[in-house]
Regions:
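SAM cofactor-binding core of SAM-dependent methyltransferases
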Residues: 1-51
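Active-site flanking residues adjacent to catalytic metal/cofactor-binding acidic residues
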Residues: 22, 62-63, 91-93
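Short conserved AdoMet
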Residues: 14-15, 56, 84
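A short acidic, Gly/Pro-enriched loop at the edge of an enzyme's catalytic core
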Residues: 52-68
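C-terminal substrate-binding/active-site "lid" region of AdoMet-derived donor-dependent transferases
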Residues: 67-131
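Nucleotide-sugar donor-binding/catalytic module of glycosyltransferases
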Residues: 40-43, 60, 71
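Alpha-helix C-terminal capping segments
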Residues: 32-35, 51-56, 102-106
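Conserved strand-to-helix beginnings and helix N-cap segments that scaffold or border functional pockets
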Residues: 7, 55, 72-76
């Protein structure tokens, strides 16, 4: 979420939704969450299991943090209990060296969207919680 631009876009696109963000250093944000009434930002390590206590049930999560598979999977494991049935969890920028491991995990559908920006790290791991 670095810089906060993605949260700002989501806040504008979905003004009736509650948008929650997590960053390890909120001083890096280039937006002021006080200007967005539907936005709440937490400062924490993405692998901190206590963050779950601060969150409501969630319908959509996009994780674009450290880009390291162990961190991403740890975050998924922490947040998965907070996903409503049918909720979607997207891990962005899955590096090519982790592609096979996510596929082997079996919970994620994999999408290669490198054609969108012609960037090597534009691969998504997408989980949909069963109804």
């Amino acid at each position: 979420m670095s810089w906060g631009g993605g949260m700002q876009i989501l806040s504008e696109l979905y003004p009736d939704s509650n948008i929650y963000g997590l960053d390890w250093d909120v001083s890096l944000l280039r937006i002021d969450p006080k200007n967005w009434s539907n936005m709440t930002i937490f400062e924490a390590d993405q692998r901190d299991p206590t963050i779950i206590d601060k969150l409501p049930m969630l319908d959509f999560v996009t994780e674009d943090c450290s880009h390291q598979m162990p961190d991403s999977i740890a975050t998924f494991e922490i947040l998965e209990p907070k996903l409503n049935p049918g909720a979607v969890y997207v891990i962005e920028d899955v590096y090519p060296q982790f592609w096979d491991a996510y596929c082997a995990d079996g919970r994620f559908d994999m999408y290669d969207v490198t054609h969108v920006k012609d960037r090597a790290d534009d691969r998504l791991a997408v989980y949909t919680k069963p109804e």
